[in-house]
Amino acid sequence: MFYSLTIISILEVLLVLVPSLLAVAYVTVAERKTMASMQRRLGPNAVGYLGLLQAFADALKLLLKEYVALTQANMTLFFLGPVITLIFSLLGYAVIPYGPSLVIQDVNLGILYMLAVSSLATYGILLAGWSANSKYAFLGSLRSAAQLISYELVLSSAILLVIMLTGSFNLGVNTESQRAVLFVLPLLPIFIIFFIGSIAETNRAPFDLAEAESELVSGFMTEHAAVVFVFFFLAEYGSIVLMCILTSILFLGGYLFINLKDVFNILDFVYSNLFIFEINWMVSERSYTEDFFNNYKSILEGWLYGWIIGLKSSIMIFIFILGRASFPRIRYDQLMGFCWTVLLPIIFALIILVPCILESFYILPWNLNLF
């Protein structure tokens, strides 16, 4: 019994982890193809059909590269930093609801778990930059730590407003609360602020000051190459995919698009009425078909839910890519000033304003029990 439960748990993790890593691989291809199209270039088109296998060719190239060990670096922490960053980047997928019951671990404090995991990834960046014994890497890690800590305040404050509407830290409850209306409509300013904070939290352009090529060569990743660089690469794009999924859950309804239960009820009705005029020799065939339909209905439902949340997340990823191709990199002082003097005052004002608006609905005339 113990071994069967262990195998099932491992399969559940692999069912989430493998598609997530494949999504990370194809996000890189989509980014290069999109930027090439905007800049009137061809982009990757030689490896596989339309360049779809370019990510695997790049991964093979990095894995086969020779790594030159640094004599002045703390090699234990130097290797440990990228691994820590990748682990905490992947741990966030454990609480993502891909359907009403399609989640590895349904945690009541799932939102707090996501914020904690994203915060701990900063330690890996700091360790990697400090242990390299390089000025460029160390400055890049300090920039990244200050940027991540600053914009985590923006993200957590924006999420707080969503929690005020739902009354729960559970991501599944937040998704189900949007069956009537998506939160992106009443909370549009908060959605915009959260999206800007997500770009800064994932070190993407125009907020990629931690790895500014013109100033810091490659930031905290300057001395990392070959296999070690792959960990940082997967962690960065894994965080992008995770933040886009979180955005789609909090504001775009996650896996909600149409009520799939109503669709399957209609299919059940159609199926049951197809056999009104059946004859006796078809009874056994019908029972077999009915069992097959009932068993695989849940699989089809989960597959559809996964496609819905994947489509919404892909739209957010595409907006990330458009931001990188459209906007120039800002200065570091502008980045920090924008957080502390613009975004935080606005979000704090909204934290006061939104509860007042919600409370005002309870004292409107049509809510007063006068008769």
UniProtKB/Swiss-Prot annotation:
It is a multi-pass membrane protein. Core subunit of the mitochondrial membrane respiratory chain NADH dehydrogenase (Complex I) that is believed to belong to the minimal assembly required for catalysis. Complex I functions in the transfer of electrons from NADH to the respiratory chain. The immediate electron acceptor for the enzyme is believed to be ubiquinone. Keywords: Electron transport, Membrane, Mitochondrion, Mitochondrion inner membrane, NAD, Respiratory chain, Translocase, Transmembrane, Transmembrane helix, Transport, Ubiquinone. GO terms for molecular function: NADH dehydrogenase (ubiquinone) activity. This is NADH-ubiquinone oxidoreductase chain 1. Its EC number is 7.1.1.2. The keyword Membrane applies. One of its GO terms (biological process) is aerobic respiration. The chain crosses the membrane at residues 7-27, 44-64, 77-97, 109-129, 153-173, 180-200, 226-246, 263-283, 302-322, 338-358. It catalyses: a ubiquinone + NADH + 5 H(+)(in) = a ubiquinol + NAD(+) + 4 H(+)(out). One of its GO terms (cellular component) is respiratory chain complex I. InterPro entries: NADH_UbQ_OxRdtase_su1/FPO, NADH_UbQ_OxRdtase_su1_CS. The keyword Mitochondrion applies. Belongs to the complex I subunit 1 family. It is an enzyme of class 7 (translocase). It is found in: Mitochondrion inner membrane.
